[in-house]
Design a protein with these regions (language model features):
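Positively charged n-region of N-terminal signal peptides that target proteins for export
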Residues: 1-5
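Bacterial N-terminal signal peptides
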Residues: 7-17
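Boundary at the C-terminal end of the N-terminal hydrophobic targeting segment
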Residues: 21-23
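N-terminal cap/lid segment of alpha/beta-hydrolase-fold proteins
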Residues: 25-63
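Loop/turn elements at helix/coil->beta-strand transitions in domains of secreted/extracellular proteins
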Residues: 49, 65-66, 91-93, 159-160, ...
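Short substrate-entry loop that stabilizes the transition state in hydrolases
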Residues: 61-65, 70-107, 196-197
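Alpha/beta-hydrolase active-site loop
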Residues: 80, 116-155
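Primarily recognizes the serine-hydrolase "nucleophile elbow" in alpha/beta-hydrolase
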Residues: 139-228
Length: 234
């Protein structure tokens, strides 16, 4: 039998985030201190563009810097991590923050709206639906891995000193990724979400979770729409 926390992952995979959390997103205009270098970048994750922000000291003390990949928590965006990115850059780190696919300024994940048309030369034109503001732990840990793939190609990155930082829901993600990627030498899990058995490990919730999965597999249940209430699966 699978551990109870596996069922928590299944259930949480398709939950939309609370709109109240999204409202806390930082405004686009913010001031970067004179001693910090800042730029934006695009990171590709499974073919989808993720919006990233890069922080580094303007006068680095070495050619290669210890690097921190930071990931936001449930319903957040990378903009919320700007104060931390600035603080770490001032301490001598190269910092990468990013919006998960379908969040913030990142592009949406796309799924076909119906059956795919015939291909021509390996290409097709199809109607698609965007998937946004859906908390999917499998996709999000993949996004963190792709952020690591990206940053090792940065000139300032020391590939032997890469660390992860995650808060809340992503605090659990960084533990998962660090256990599977030998390039990660350290991680910080701030109030990390590690175990949801208290909310899911009962027969009623398991039945509900698997019922949702069956309906989705049959195509009778769509992904939640953006802006739904916390915990809603409709």
């Amino acid at each position: 039998m699978r551990p109870a926390h596996v069922f928590a992952t299944i259930a949480l995979a398709l939950l939309p985030a609370c709109s109240g959390v999204r409202a806390q997103d930082a405004k686009p205009g913010f001031r970067v201190p004179d001693d910090v270098a800042f730029r934006t970048a695009d990171i590709m994750s499974e073919g989808t563009r993720m919006a990233a922000e890069i922080f580094a000291p303007k006068a680095p003390k070495s050619e290669k810097l210890p690097t921190i990949v930071m990931s936001h928590g449930w319903g957040g965006t990378a903009a919320l991590l700007r104060p931390d990115g600035i603080a770490f850059a001032r301490a001598g780190y190269l910092v990468v923050t990013f919006d998960y696919r379908g969040w913030g300024r990142s592009d949406s994940r796309l799924i076909p709206a119906g059956k795919a048309p015939e291909k021509k030369d390996g290409k097709l034109i199809a109607e698609v639906k965007e998937v946004r503001e859906v908390v999917d732990p499998i996709d999000q840990t993949t996004d963190i891995l792709n952020a690591i793939h990206w940053v090792v190609g940065e000139k300032l990155c020391d590939p032997e000193r890469i660390g992860l930082w995650g808060s809340s829901y992503s605090g659990g993600h960084v533990v998962y990724v660090a256990a599977r990627d030998p390039r990660v030498k350290a991680f910080v899990s701030q109030v990390g979400a590690m175990d949801s058995r208290w909310s899911i490990a009962n027969p009623q919730m398991r039945a509900y979770t698997f019922g949702q999965a069956t309906a989705r597999a049959h195509g009778s249940l769509e992904y939640p729409k953006p802006g739904g209430k916390f915990g809603s699966l409709t």
